[in-house]
């Protein structure tokens, strides 16, 4: 082997050794997993189910979470003595609407705080429907106040047929404190939640969120069940990011 060839082999071998050493010296860049997105869900009156499912309100919507993780929250979902959580009536043993809402509020807030504690970087969407929307509205107000330790920047809200909808909801139309038959008006909810994007969804003439005319009485029976159906409002909107205010739908 000529001297020139020996030098070429030595240079190639040396270069290869340097490249191997450099590769070994460069640390592997870790790619962090994307933040998880939890949907904390409180269902409507009469929709209670055994844990861990807790509610039947989101059976179709949860098929459209785009990788999100549903967190169903149990509560009575009742309006006793008129209706129990399993849509049976009358039931004199069922918790009243007011009692049910209070328990829904406590359980939903506890679920949000526990989820944040276990996964501090995760996004949380607070979701409520009908009676569940009232409790979810109040939970979002609590988080917006800064009293929970959950950063507002991680939170959003989806309220379907919210009775506290400003201006048009049944509780916006009845004075705060009005009470009868186990129902007490908390008054309207806020239009904005101090930086938390919260969107309300209402089908016109649904008397829960659109108590603006006599037609809302019959409209409640016709429109109120539609949100949770396959291909309807919830399935089309639950995974949408951001947005504020009220989204109206025609009957």
Residue ranges and their predicted role:
Residues 126-141:
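Gly/Ala-rich beta-loop-alpha elbow adjacent to hydrolase catalytic centers
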Residues 23, 113-120:
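Short, solvent-exposed loop/edge-beta patches enriched in aromatic
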Residues 117-129:
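Alpha/beta-hydrolase fold nucleophile elbow
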Residues 11, 134-138, 177-181:
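A short linear-motif detector with a strong N-terminal bias
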Residues 1-32:
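Secretory targeting and sorting signals
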Residues 13-14, 89-93, 120:
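Generic alpha-helix detector with strongest preference for long hydrophobic helices that associate
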Residues 2-8, 33, 51, 119, ...:
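Serine/threonine-rich low-complexity intrinsically disordered regions
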């Amino acid at each position: 082997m000529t001297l020139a060839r020996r030098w070429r082999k030595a240079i190639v071998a040396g270069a290869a050794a340097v490249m191997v050493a450099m590769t070994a010296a460069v640390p592997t860049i870790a790619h962090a997993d994307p933040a998880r997105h939890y949907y904390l869900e409180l269902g409507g009156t009469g929709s209670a189910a055994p844990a861990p499912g807790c509610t039947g309100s989101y059976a179709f919507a949860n098929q459209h979470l785009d990788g999100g993780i549903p967190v169903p929250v149990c509560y009575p979902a009742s309006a006793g003595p008129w209706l129990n959580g399993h849509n049976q009536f009358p039931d004199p043993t069922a918790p009243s609407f007011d009692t049910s809402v209070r328990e829904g509020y406590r359980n939903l807030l506890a679920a949000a705080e526990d989820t944040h504690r276990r996964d501090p970087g995760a996004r949380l969407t607070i979701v409520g429907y009908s009676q569940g929307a009232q409790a979810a509205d109040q939970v979002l107000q609590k988080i917006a106040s800064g009293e929970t330790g959950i950063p507002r920047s991680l939170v959003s809200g989806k309220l379907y047929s919210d009775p506290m909808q400003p201006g048009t909801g049944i509780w916006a139309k009845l004075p705060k404190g009005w009470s009868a038959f186990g129902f007490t008006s908390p008054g309207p909810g806020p239009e904005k939640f101090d930086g938390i994007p919260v969107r309300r969804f209402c089908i016109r003439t649904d008397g829960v969120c659109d108590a603006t005319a006599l037609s809302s009485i019959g409209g409640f029976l016709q429109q109120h069940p539609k949100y949770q159906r396959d291909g309807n409002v919830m399935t089309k909107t639950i995974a949408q990011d951001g947005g504020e205010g009220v989204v109206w739908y025609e009957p």
